[in-house]
Every structure is written in C-alpha cells, then in structure tokens.
Amino acid sequence: MDRISHLADEILSKILSFLGTKDVMQTMLLSKRFKSQWLLVPKLEFDDSTHLPETWGYQEPDYGNFRRFVDRSLLSREGRVLQTLFLKLGRQCSYDDIAIWVGIAVKRGLMELKLKYTDSYYPKRSSLPRSLYTCETLVVLKLKKGYLDVPDLVCLRSLKTLSLRDMNYSNASCLLRLLASCPVLEELFIQQGYYDSCALSFKIILPCLKKLSYLPKRKKKYSGIDRSEVSGGISGLVLDAPSLKYLHIVDRSGLFSVSEIININAVVKATLEVNASRPEKLLYSLVSVEHIRLCLSATEVVYPVGLGSSFHKLKRLEVCTCKSEWLDLFIHLLEDSPSLQDIKINQCHPVTNPRPQWNQPGSVPRCLSSSLETLEWVEYGGTHEEKELSTYLFKTAVCFKKASFTAKWSGGDANKKLQMLQELALSPRVSPTCELVFN
C-alpha cells in the first residue's frame, strides 16, 4: 500500500482508470490521499445491472439507488475534466436522467461517450440530448440500441469514430444529417438489427474517412429463419472517401444498390458480401485494393471491357463458393489481377443452386505464370467443377509453393474422401516446388 501511495498522481489515475467506477470510489477508504485521487480519473463507467437490492432471489436492479450513485459521482467532480463516460442501462432508465448525465459530461470536456441499452425495450424518448450534437470536444461516439433523432442543428467537428449498433432512426434522413456534420470522421461502423426491414440511404462524402463497416446483426436462429439475412440494407450508395483504406460491407437483404462511386481509390483491404443486381460498379472501383474477400450474388454481372488489369495491386483474393456465380467471377478476377500471390476459396454459407459450369479461360492469366504462390481451399467437395479448376491451377501456376485442401465431409464417407484426396495428389503440377497439404 505504501508503494502505491508514493506513485505520481498521473500514474495512479491511470491505474484507477482500469477499475469500475464503484471500485474506484471505494478506494477513498484506503487513505486521505485517495479521498480526492479518484476525482482525477478521467473515465467513469456506470452499469445499472450492478445495483441490486439487498434481498435474496432474483430482483430487478435498484434503479433509484443507481441514479443516486451516478448523480453523486458526477456532481462531486465539479470542475474536473471527464474524458470518457460509459453508460450501460436497462429498461428502467429515464431519458431525463440520461439528458442530465450527458449534459454534465459535455460541460466537462467529454471526448468519448459509450451508451448501451441492455434491453430491447429502451425508452421511447431515448434520443440523445441536444447538447451532445454540438459538443466540440467529442471524438468517439458509440451507441448500441436506442433511438436516433438528429436535430437540424448538429456540428461534431472533432468526432473521429462513430459506431451505431442495432439503432432505430427517426426518419430516413437523420443518419445522412449526422454524417454530414462530422468533417473529420475517420471510422464509421454501422450494424443493423434483424428487426429493421427498411433500407438505409447512404450518401457518404467524408474526406477523412479511413474505415467503413456495414454489417447485419450477429446471426441468430429463430424458428429456422436466419434473421441476419432479412435485416435492413443499403439503398442508393453514394461513396466519396478519398482517404478510405478499409471497406467492409455485408448486405444480403437484396436491397443493396449503388448510385455513384466517386473516389475510393485508396482502399487496400475490402470485404464485400452483398446480394445485388449489378455489384461490379462497386467492385471495379477498388483500383488500389491489395486484399479482397468476396461473396457476391448477382442476377447479372457485367465485367468492364478494355480496362486491362483492373486489380494491378491485388495480392490476396478470398472467394466464397456459396453462390452460383462464384466461378465466373473468380476467373475474371484471375485475369484482372497480374500480381496475385495468394488465393483462398471457401464455402462460408449454405450452397445455392444451380451450381456453376467450368469454362476454361482462352489464355492463361498472367498471375498464374508469374506470381501466384499459395492456394488454400476450405470445404473442398470434389465436384466436377472443383476438380476442373484445381487441375487447371496445378497445370498453369508455375510459381506454386503450397496448395492446401480441407475436405467438406468431416464425418462423411471415408472412402469417398480418400478417393478425392488421391485424385488431388495424382494431379500433375507444373511447379516442381509445390507442396500439397491435406487438412
């Protein structure tokens, strides 16, 4: 205890910031110094589920006790800087209380706000207080569940990270209004709930944006229905983000569409899992991508003609085989990626019918004769098309160093599995250094 007491205030505050707020306040009992030391901690976390009545058996959290604790904690820090406020609230929370707490934090120079509702039955008036939308110091805003109602007057000039999980929106334009008010935003994460069946109109014109993620709610099964497949989607995407490095879009709603891609020329890593009528407008805008993961379902894919090597920087390609269009897409990407080094083929989702037909390229793609080194094939089933593709790669990839296969049948016919692996082992390989691995 003596050794801790001799630490500098800055170091001691850093140590205390890793504790929960209740534990931090209890340190006041340790010594006279700690009575004021906790006031220097720039981070406060409050969870109403930890405030239970002192009775046996299951009880709802004592919200009155929790509210008094938060009030006391915030008001006792008058004049002190509060950098981070984390509120984890249940169904008993009051909008008026949230407005007061966030308002106090804004006046104390709030830099990071995390607000999470643990219950789907959040208050109807659960929108954020107006003072937050003009907070000049706010850098990080993370919201989970709740209701977003963005006022006309909004300016978040310092906000760099915005995370919205399972949110409901007051109208179609409120999200656009919020994004337009964040001139230095660098990271945007949006996760839609399975209960949200409407499409979001996305117009993202953010010169500083570096990372963009749009995902459905984490998969849950209800009566055999995968709700992540029917969550809301993106409609009419407009994207102008010249600083964007990482792009991750998962939208299987069938609502996905692209209106205009102005500039995403800096993207180096991208994941696209979308059901769309014409996904190539987005795909072929990724001119600088080095690593791409694709699961595309399209009624029609029109591959650009006359562009030459569209993906001249692409080093790693990952393709999902669940959609019937995957093989045609894969061959086109081989032809358009002269520097490709690594390939991963995987069945990430249930297979759709009909299955693709193998059409050998008219000429050998340049990457097969100059750069492709590794192949990883997960969920290899030994179908006719898969055999044709693997044989073609073995015969043409002169730089192959390693090809690994994981069989689809983990508990199926052992003889069929053995025969499938033997066929792969006996396939002629043009590369003398190619190592064949079976997992």
Curated annotation (Swiss-Prot):
Coiled coil residues, start to end: none
Secretion signal span: none
Classification via Pfam families: F-box (PF00646), FBD (PF08387), LRR_At5g56370 (PF24758)
Domain FBD: 358-406
Superkingdom of origin organism: Eukaryota
Domain F-box per the UniProt entry, residue ranges: 1-61
UniProt name for this protein: FBD-associated F-box protein At5g56380
